[in-house]
């Protein structure tokens, strides 16, 4: 009798939520399978999606740990700001999702990889104009960058604590 599947709890989870959590779970499962500790970055990832306070639930069979009653609000540590559509000849083509600037600390989350920092030097908007600000949801933009990322990689902005 082994584990045959995992379920991500909740309804209507976003692409950002699903990508972040499944990437972290995959890294954790692979580590456990190989007899290694779960990587710290994978544990940290589940806190980077919008979530309510985590608890152990029924895991330790304690009556007082089954639910968390102090606050039912959501916690969010990162904003989902864009999707990488393609990378060709050093050019990264993106679709902007939420406001960001080239001065923001950004990260890229790609399937099966540890998230990496992204320092965007400038942006070219859909009118062909150079800008430092992405403030039109779903606008197609691009920038030149020495590293290539797979299509559908996610760009996020960690929020100040």
Indicate residue ranges for each PLM-predicted region:
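Surface-exposed amphipathic alpha-helical tracts and adjacent flexible/coil segments at the periphery
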Residues: 1-161
């Amino acid at each position: 009798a082994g584990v045959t599947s995992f379920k991500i709890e909740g309804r209507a989870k976003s692409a950002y939520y699903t990508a972040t959590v499944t990437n972290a779970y995959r890294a954790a499962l692979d580590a456990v399978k190989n007899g290694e500790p779960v990587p710290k970055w994978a544990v940290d990832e589940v806190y980077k999606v919008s979530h309510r306070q985590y608890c152990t639930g029924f895991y330790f069979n304690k009556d007082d740990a089954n639910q968390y009653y102090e606050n039912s609000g959501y916690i969010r540590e990162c904003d989902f700001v864009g999707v990488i559509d393609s990378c060709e000849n050093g050019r990264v083509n993106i679709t902007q999702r939420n406001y960001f600037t080239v001065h923001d600390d950004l990260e890229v989350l790609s399937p099966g990889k540890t998230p990496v920092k992204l320092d965007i030097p400038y942006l070219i908007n859909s009118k062909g104009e150079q800008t430092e600000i992405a403030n039109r949801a779903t606008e197609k933009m691009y920038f030149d960058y020495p590293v290539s990322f797979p299509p559908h990689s996610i760009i996020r902005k960690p929020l100040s604590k």
